[in-house]
């Protein structure tokens, strides 16, 4: 905003007050505005409706479809949306709740626990102290960009500390792959030759931004690991939820929970779908992140080509698949509306604008008039995917090639 346009804005805003009678007062106000103090919250109906339905007065994001639990993912995404909306009050409350309840009161000392909710004894507390690396990345990114955009050094410093801890505790060197992001600090390295990875945990724009902010860190090489993870760990051009990497190569894999289930099953049941690699609720975010990234993001063209199966499928089908198996076969076509939202930026990025409009139309057709949310139940995950996709489609935010956030209000 130029000084002239700022002066005109203030003149309109305060035309009926005495403030403009004092040139000194106006100068003070202008200075404050240039420091971010007069930027107003941007109207965003979907964000407002999501806040009403899922965020309590303390800043806790509640997943009503999962026993009212809270995850670090939900907190991280909501902090991002609050930043896009220039909603400082909700950002502050979300951060405060996260630090108090998921990080033992101090994010400088530990990574946040991923799951919080009602325990079997009826108490509300951390259910699993293990951190989730993708949520940790998002929170670090949110803090770094909030510090820059709102000119708050505390946020930037906290984001840097968090990113450094992620590099120490959740970044690993995997034979045959290189330096990459482990999905969590515990439970994802079951033996000396196996690492369990999740491609959707590596948004290219976040890694590109961390590489810029912390040039001596591992982030550029972590971003480089996404290409082989997708090229060797996908199936028929479809991203998988989980990838196994290590001495035996890179291939579609199982989550820790699936591996545990297999160990408990008798042999005749081990071919069941829930114990085989699939692409579904995690993998859908791979398409979303690639679509949101700036076209000039390092390596993006190759990354998009690794998951071209989704683009090919949607040339001839109205909705994305809900489940794809490890051979690239479509198992379930009943994708929720959030899946349609997630592929809109991706389809746009690969030049399929007509197909992108079809997915946006499908999403819009599922909007509930009373709640303003998408889908019959207004599910947590659908709303988050929709907030990312519609926020981008409505040009409320963009990422540049180095991952810097450019919100509409800036």
Per-region residue spans from a language model:
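Extended ligand-binding clefts on enzyme/binding-domain cores
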Residues: 42-45, 68-72, 130-134, 156-341, ...
């Amino acid at each position: 905003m130029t000084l002239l346009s700022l002066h005109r804005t203030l003149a309109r805003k305060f035309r009926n007050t005495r403030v403009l009678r004092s040139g000194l007062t106006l100068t003070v106000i202008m200075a404050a505005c240039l420091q971010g103090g007069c930027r107003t919250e941007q109207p965003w109906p979907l964000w407002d409706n999501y806040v009403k339905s899922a965020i309590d007065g303390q800043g806790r994001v509640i997943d009503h479809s999962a026993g009212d639990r809270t995850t670090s993912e939900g907190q991280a995404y909501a902090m991002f949306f609050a930043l896009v909306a220039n909603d400082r009050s909700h950002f502050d409350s979300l951060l405060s709740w996260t630090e108090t309840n998921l990080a033992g009161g101090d994010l400088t000392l530990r990574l946040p626990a991923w799951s919080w909710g009602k325990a079997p004894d009826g108490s509300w507390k951390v259910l699993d102290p293990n951190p989730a690396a993708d949520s940790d990345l998002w929170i670090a990114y949110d803090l770094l960009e909030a510090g820059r955009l709102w000119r708050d050094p505390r946020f930037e410093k906290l984001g840097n500390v968090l990113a450094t801890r992620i590099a120490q505790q959740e970044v690993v060197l995997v034979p045959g792959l290189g330096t990459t992001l482990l999905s969590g600090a515990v439970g994802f390295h079951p033996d000396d030759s196996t690492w369990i990875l999740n491609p959707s945990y590596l948004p290219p724009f976040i890694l590109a931004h961390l590489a810029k902010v912390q040039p001596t860190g591992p982030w550029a090489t972590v971003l480089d690991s996404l290409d082989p993870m997708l090229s060797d760990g996908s199936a028929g051009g479809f991203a998988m939820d989980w990838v196994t990497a290590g001495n035996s190569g890179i291939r579609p894999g199982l989550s820790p929970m699936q591996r545990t289930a297999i160990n408990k099953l008798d042999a005749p049941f081990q071919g069941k779908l829930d114990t085989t690699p699939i692409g579904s609720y995690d993998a859908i975010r791979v398409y979303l992140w690639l679509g949101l990234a700036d076209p000039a993001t390092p390596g993006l063209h190759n990354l998009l080509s690794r998951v071209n199966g989704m683009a090919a499928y949607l040339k001839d089908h109205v909705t994305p698949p809900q489940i794809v198996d490890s051979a690239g076969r479509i198992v379930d076509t009943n994708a929720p509306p959030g899946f349609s939202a997630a592929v809109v930026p991706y389809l746009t990025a690969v030049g399929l604008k007509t197909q992108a409009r079809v997915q946006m139309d499908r999403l819009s057709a599922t909007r509930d008039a009373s709640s303003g949310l998408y889908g019959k139940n207004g599910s947590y995950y659908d709303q988050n995917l929709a907030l990312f996709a519609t926020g981008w489609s409505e040009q409320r935010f963009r990422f540049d090639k180095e991952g810097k956030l450019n919100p509409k209000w800036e």
